């Protein structure tokens, strides 16, 4: 087993390498003057099982192309098999046609990864579980729920807690966390007039005098979560804690969160946000490297990955 990292999130790759006590494969990933990406594997990997770690995060197009070219380089270097470890699977939000004459980018990206030569994919909290079915190769979709539940038990005080889904699509994810914590759930009915903008309409469930725990897979511009927190406080919630797997945090998201009614936002390091959150005191990052490292170890040893979540 050998590990290779792309440029999208070297921090998490180094942590996984340390967890597995395995050095990263030496490689050169450069750009030509016209922006084309150049990949070279600088050591022999013939006959080895390779785990390539690369998130499809901003700049999404460059990081996607880098992922595909790395897979191609590994294939042409006679790797025995290639597992694409994609902590954040970009383009997953376009998983169906939401309007006439639109693309389904999640399916296209799945095809590209498969055609490039990947034998397996490992990712974390896919935006829609059915994306696993877009692939013709095995996909292990890991969950941040165990990491979040441990943090909540240690850090969120009080007995009157409730888990909150920020929209109807997040109910299953919220229910999974609520089961682990033995809590009830509430749901926010959200209407989105345009992409990137949201308006909270209604809260389904009693949140008065309760500590609310919002759970979701992605925070992008921050509008959905900030509006959700405000709606909960306006309906009598005591305080709002937010747990989100992928911190995209585009534009002025960190500023919105700093000024919002959110007591604290907890994200994972599937996306490298070290520069964005330096001044945001109410944003905390939990590392998901041990979960990914353990999954890689189990795949390499042909043992169960699903047992991690029992």
Regions found by a protein language model. Name each.
Residues 1-310:
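PRPP-associated nucleotide enzymes
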């Amino acid at each position: 087993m050998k590990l290779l990292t792309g440029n999208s999130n070297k921090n998490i790759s180094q942590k996984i390498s340390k967890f597995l006590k395995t050095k990263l494969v030496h490689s050169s990933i450069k750009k030509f003057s016209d922006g084309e990406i150049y990949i070279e594997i600088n050591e022999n990997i013939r006959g080895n099982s390779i785990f390539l770690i690369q998130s499809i995060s901003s700049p999404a197009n460059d990081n996607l192309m880098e992922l595909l070219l790395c897979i191609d380089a590994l294939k042409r270097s006679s790797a025995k098999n290639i597992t694409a470890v994609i902590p954040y699977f970009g383009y997953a939000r376009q998983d169906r046609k939401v309007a006439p004459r639109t693309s389904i980018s999640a399916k296209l990206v799945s095809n590209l990864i498969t055609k490039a030569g990947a034998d397996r994919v490992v990712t974390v909290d896919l935006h829609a579980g059915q994306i696993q079915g877009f692939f013709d190769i095995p996909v292990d979709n890991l969950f941040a729920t165990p990491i979040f539940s441990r943090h909540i038990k240690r850090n969120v005080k009080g007995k009157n807690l409730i888990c909150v889904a920020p929209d109807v699509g997040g109910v299953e994810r919220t229910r999974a966390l609520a089961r682990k914590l033995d809590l009830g759930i509430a749901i926010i009915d959200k209407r989105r007039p345009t992409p990137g903008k949201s308006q909270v309409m209604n809260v389904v469930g009693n949140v008065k005098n309760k500590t609310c725990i919002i759970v979701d897979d992605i925070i992008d511009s921050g509008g959905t979560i900030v509006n959700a927190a405000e709606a909960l406080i306006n309906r009598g919630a005591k305080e709002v804690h937010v747990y989100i797997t992928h911190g995209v945090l585009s534009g002025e998201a960190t500023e919105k969160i700093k000024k919002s009614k959110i007591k604290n936002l907890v994200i994972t390091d599937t996306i490298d946000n070290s520069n964005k959150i330096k001044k945001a005191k109410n944003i905390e990052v939990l590392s998901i490297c041990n979960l990914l490292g353990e999954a890689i170890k189990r795949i390499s040893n042909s043992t169960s990955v699903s047992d991690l979540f029992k």
